[in-house]
């Protein structure tokens, strides 16, 4: 039998009055005896402190403070300690004979709060010879010792071999160790458990009936049916988990779509961007290479353009220089043409003026003759008029004389006046102031003679004038001609000069005749010279373009060579066109083929992805469509086999579930009907009675009872006989055994035990041999063991079933995948790799592009050579006909020579043209120049003077004649009028006068008209002379201007000048055109160079930027690739089919996915933030982080109890497989897990019955307990009425409330709480939740009401209350209750602690003086019967007869307070020896 653990001793170190005191504890009762203040309570306080070191619970008060809530501030502990380190230690021996020392180190904490610091510790493996005081003290001398600190204690124990020291930071750990080693009876897991234990100790210490315990006896006495509760909790948890799993499945079904949506959209979003970046990286690399190629090409082009620019600039400079000279030549030619035209116009004017002058000269000569004739006629008219005037005057005078004669006085007076007038006129005219009428006659003769002489002289001079005038006009004309030709000269030199001019004129005329031939010759030579110069220019240009100087003799050979080269290049160009066409056709075919392959590549890649997925899923590699179809047939066969095996495993699992369900019935009833029959018969199942049988005894009892192990034990068989009639709802064999269920044993059979078998003698003639079953199920332990093994088997079967179901689903899905693959991709999956073909074709395309580029360069060079050759041939075609000109080196000299001769001839022609008419006129009259009639003017003057003298003499003679004629009239001064002697004469005179006057009038009119005509003729002559002079001056001016022009104006001069100007204009135009072309070309070249420079800068910038971008992108791409590879998502993101989409398509795909993702992650803050961060186009790695975050988020949302993978994509596939199977399995599991309300009621009832039976057995132990008038103590256990109603409803009327228990929204606990509220609406549930209430209703303790009853005197059984009992009776009754509690705790803890440990039992009783001797004897008897230790504190007048007694006396010695302790054994004869602690009776322990 297992020995119970005991407390050996209590050690106090440095307590108030106890420096180092060890109290050896008795195995039953230890009594502390002493007066007030002796230290009894301090000793028990030290014990309690070591047992429960919880400052929140410890409160040591005396009886006067009982019930007080505010005692001393230190709660009684601080004042019981001395300053410094204090210890309280318990030395124990457990059932395993292990010595364990547990205790606490206490130390006062300085301050107003009077706190105490407590450190629990434990010592194991301490030898029996070592006393606790030796451990914690160090002897300094004979009378002094020092208390060790906890660290020093630890170091001291570490030096001892085999001793273990443990210090605890948690009271729970301290109590856990004490429970495991059997020091305390209950595992104190929480502060609530410690509080219960402390309340029990406190109730024991202060005695009496503790209201704190009696109010909660259920918590102290009734064990927490943790198994049932755990079963309920597990069932509910399983149901909850099942429902949560079902809900999770439903959520997962939606999550599946979310998974698909998230994965699809996230993959599209990230993969599109990933592939776009991959494509862009490739494109950027290609662009960088293209930029570099273009950069090199542009540099070459720029260099070529620079060379071309230099050549064109040089040529442009040459043309600019040539243009200046050509412009000067052209301007000179234009000016020369203008001069020639001006000279021609001048020449025309000169000729016109000369013709006009000749005409004017002729008209002038004619007019001179007309004027001369008119002058002569005027003179005649004047003479005639004078004669008529004279005749009229004479007639008038005659008529006057006649009338005077008739009238002497009048007439003579008139005559006299007239005579006087005539005399005065004669004096004036004749310049004779002394002239008198008498001398008039003489002077008349003189003057008449003078007149005659003047007339003769005038006639002579007139004759001379006529001859001189003819000679003078010829000489003057000839002289003027000579002066006009030669210029001013002396008149004497005119003859010689005229002859020289006539000779020179002949020569000049001969030279002038040679102008036209010379001009034609010069024009021809100049044309040849220009052609020679053009040929030289062409040759120089040809040599310049050819880059080599050629001799004239080499040109024909070069022409033939170029002709041959042109023919060869023409063939080459023609062949090049065909070759280029062939290359381009091949390139187009390649491009078309590549486009076709690029269109087919995504389909092929999709087929390959599907094929790879199939290969990964099935672990096979397929190389042909036939292998795929063959494997599909194998899949079908495998699916059939897996279905068969799954069905077999499912059947076995169902059988195991049924067996587990059968074995899980309450009370071990495999048939539910047995519980009903047991309740009906008022019996107990035999299996329930033996429910606590150990696993070792289970085979024996199973064989012992055999088929009757499911019997019902009834108190009286005779009472149920009638109930058996008509019983149908029962098993086929129903065994009934008569017996007391409370004290049933196996004595009903006669049994012989054999080896692993029994022989049961049922009757004299009937034996039964039963072997021990290999798997016994009799008793709870055996059933639990069997259920455990069945659960293990079920787990294996479930796992196998799940595996097989998964395999079947997987196989079916694989079959579907193969079917889809065959339907969609089989036709293209095993074709050649289009990407490999694309790579090969791209390589070939690159080769073709390179060949085309090379061909284009060669063709360009050939075309350039061809064009150069054609230009060379064209230039040579222009040059070859002019080779003779190029070879003619004297052409320029001949041109100069002819030019000189032409200049002379043109000079002669100009001389002839200018002076030819004068020379022609000079030639017939040149002879007149031999003598110069220079007296002509003098003669002309003499003639005029003679003519005037003759006129004056005539007038003088006439005036003198008139005076002479009127000489007689001078004498009539005194006379009268003379009368006429004949009237007829007067008449005749009058007639003649009228005729004379008429004649005079006519003469006057004729004179007047002739004078006007003469005046007109003179005016015409004057105008002609003026016109002649003017035109002569103009002619001279024109001739001078012509001479000033200095240009020979012949008939061909203008044509030659115009031809020269046009040639120069053509050359200038060509030069300008070429210059403009060069300028344009140069401008274009400069623009091209600028463009190339800008392009080059841009290319360099773009190349460097692209290179930097490529390098940066490479770093970013490396980071992206590293992140992709580290997270294992490359296979998800590198979707090769996306490589064939454009960047816009990929961006559109990514943007669409982004929009969908924004909606999908709108409720997820983390993914929303990561998604927002991933939208940065400059940080592509953030999209990978988002993808990883999505995968991580989906991994976290994957229920590992449903899906066995971390990959969300595989999770989707497994979801499809698992969801339907799990739904079915969990639905059936829920049906199996769901416990019926009847079963719950039965379980609670059975538990209540069992605990009632246990309480009755505890009551049997208290029946003999008596204290004073109390004869017996018992516990009364009743079921509450409201809860009994609940059990009845659960058992009999559960169908009425299935709306609660069949609801998937309510757990069983919540449904139970709802039912309780429905049945008891009057009860206020407060703020508690239905789940809390339901859990309380699942605890059977809440169904029971417990109260303590005592049998006291004549009152009989009544409720134990302090007011109804004496103090001693209350203490005894309370102690009895505490003993029941401790025993109940041990029974409850037996399942938790090892089977080989029986815990220590110890209670306290302070102030035991209230008990009488009989009551104390009862306590001693109770302790002995229950193997319990008891510490009693009693006054000095209490001396128990048994146990150990310590006498405590507090003394003061030398100002030092200490407690004197004397220990004695009990007075009973069986314990005569004195305890070791009593030997120091006279030697007090003193504190140093």
Swiss-Prot record:
ATP-binding among keywords: yes
Compositionally skewed regions (Basic and acidic residues) per UniProt: 1051-1065
Cellular component, GO, one term: nucleoid
First-listed, main subcellular location of the protein, grouped into a coarse class: cytoplasm
Start and end residues of each stretch annotated as Flexible hinge: 666-783
Coiled coil: 326-418, 444-472, 509-602, 835-923, 977-1116, 1209-1265
Key words of the record: ATP-binding, Cell cycle, Cell division, Chromosome partition, Coiled coil, Cytoplasm, DNA condensation, DNA-binding, Nucleotide-binding
GO MF term list: ATP binding; DNA binding
Transmembrane segments: none
GO terms (BP aspect): cell division; chromosome condensation; chromosome segregation; DNA replication
Subcellular location: Cytoplasm, Nucleoid
Listed SUPFAM superfamilies: P-loop containing nucleoside triphosphate hydrolases
Residue numbers spanned by region Disordered: 1049-1074
Listed Pfam families: MukB, MukB_hinge, SbcC_Walker_B
Residues binding ATP: 34-41
Function of the protein: Plays a central role in chromosome condensation, segregation and cell cycle progression. Functions as a homodimer, which is essential for chromosome partition. Involved in negative DNA supercoiling in vivo, and by this means organize and compact chromosomes. May achieve or facilitate chromosome segregation by condensation DNA from both sides of a centrally located replisome during cell division.
Recorded domain comment: The hinge domain, which separates the large intramolecular coiled coil regions, allows the homodimerization, forming a V-shaped homodimer.
Family recorded in the similarity comment: Belongs to the SMC family. MukB subfamily.
Assembly behavior: Homodimerization via its hinge domain. Binds to DNA via its C-terminal region. Interacts, and probably forms a ternary complex, with MukE and MukF via its C-terminal region. The complex formation is stimulated by calcium or magnesium. Interacts with tubulin-related protein FtsZ.
NCBIfam families given in the database record: PRK04863.1
Stated name of the protein: Chromosome partition protein MukB
Organism: Salmonella arizonae (strain ATCC BAA-731 / CDC346-86 / RSK2980)
